[in-house]
Amino acid sequence: HDKTAKDVPLEIELSLDEFPSPQQLWAKYKVFKGITEPENERITSQDYYFDGSGRRPRYYQQIAINRTIEAIAKGQNRILITMATGTGKTYVAFQIAYRLWKAGVKKRILFLADRNALIDQANRNDFKHFGDKKTVVKNRRVDKSYEVYLAIYQGLSGSEEEKNIYKQFTRGFFDLIIIFQILIIYLITPWT
């Protein structure tokens, strides 16, 4: 089945010597996905993070990660990913952040969540792989020498002006902001 072709039948029989090489298949795939610029190819071809444990993204996680990376490579700035409980949302967020960071297109990343438990879990598990490039924003103190920041919404702003530490970051300071579990925040807080 060739879903990339426009003027040929979807299904044709090929002999083994007619079958496209991996390079030809990759070229067709890139055209089909609109990955035509070298920069876009560099972003989309950046591999996942593998820690040697054998853990790999599940098929549905790969779909979410790859579609997000492809959308960003094409210039899309806002992306909503919806996943059910227990499907590995934090791992997906980490893989997206890692691939974009490693490709060099997103150098400063902010991961926002609504509660400390989510930040602690992300810091302890998936995001630990950023090592000394990562920090958790605590006690309303910011060190701008890091590349990856994990914070809770309430830790960046408050009802009093001096608690609004988000103002210490200039507009555009972050290249990528991951707002984790936004629906919960939207429904239960006055942040709307």
Mark where each language-model region is:
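Short, flexible cytosolic linker that couples an ABC transmembrane/permease module to its adjacent nucleotide-binding
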Residues: 134-140
